[in-house]
Swiss-Prot record:
The record marks 151, 207 as: Positions MEP for the nucleophilic attack. GO terms for biological process: isopentenyl diphosphate biosynthetic process, methylerythritol 4-phosphate pathway. Keywords: Isoprene biosynthesis, Nucleotidyltransferase, Transferase. This is 2-C-methyl-D-erythritol 4-phosphate cytidylyltransferase. Belongs to the IspD/TarI cytidylyltransferase family. IspD subfamily. The record marks 14, 21 as: Transition state stabilizer. Catalyzes the formation of 4-diphosphocytidyl-2-C-methyl-D-erythritol from CTP and 2-C-methyl-D-erythritol 4-phosphate (MEP). Pfam families: IspD (PF01128). Its EC number is 2.7.7.60. InterPro entries: IspD (IPR001228), IspD/TarI (IPR034683), IspD/TarI_cytidylyltransf_bact (IPR050088), ISPD_synthase_CS (IPR018294), Nucleotide-diphossugar_trans (IPR029044). Pathway: Isoprenoid biosynthesis; isopentenyl diphosphate biosynthesis via DXP pathway; isopentenyl diphosphate from 1-deoxy-D-xylulose 5-phosphate: step 2/6. It comes from the Bacteria.
Amino acid sequence: MYTLIIPAAGQGKRMGAGKNKLFLLINGVPIIVHTLRAFEKDKACKRIIMAINEEERPYFEELMQKYPVEKQVQFIQGGAERQDSVYNALQYVSGVEYVLVHDGARPFVTNKMMQDVLTAAEKYGASICAVPVKDTIKKVEQGVVVETVERSQLKAVQTPQGFSVPLLLEAHRSAKQSCFLGTDDASLVERVGKKVGVVEGSYYNIKVTTPEDLLIAESFLHVQKK
């Protein structure tokens, strides 16, 4: 069993929508609702904690009225950074040994990914899902290529990411004490010297970040319904 944490206080500036991108629609339904419905199917998910911008609480509560989910969803105050939101949410976790942290803007997560991440977290204490990098990666400085990076060992990391609760708390507290800001929760665990297991993600498991992603998401949903 696990508790799901969704940091949902971000502004989504790259989307340029003027509002939280989680409220944007895919096939007439808000992105966050698609995501919640995906986890609703997972029996191992005990409850859901969403770290939100307090000003948006009425909008989230209205969504839950319009699109109810059976699992318990708790809204808590998010932080200035995604990392702060996850840390705040951890303070409300109880009764489970593991948490999964997931981007609310990844609505195409599958039950297999959830289970694989949880299993790997039980084995290693921390886990991520990832896919091989397909494009050539180059390091660029001041507009000039300085290195072509060997991509055979590179992975594009996704969510969900799974953790034992004590380990993730330790990693967050250490980062907080050192004013360290990581790019994801797994990077905080790496920082304290712990292993992070890796399981297979999916190229369908996109994070809806730009207007182009919305079009791709609509296409994915259309394919799923066929």
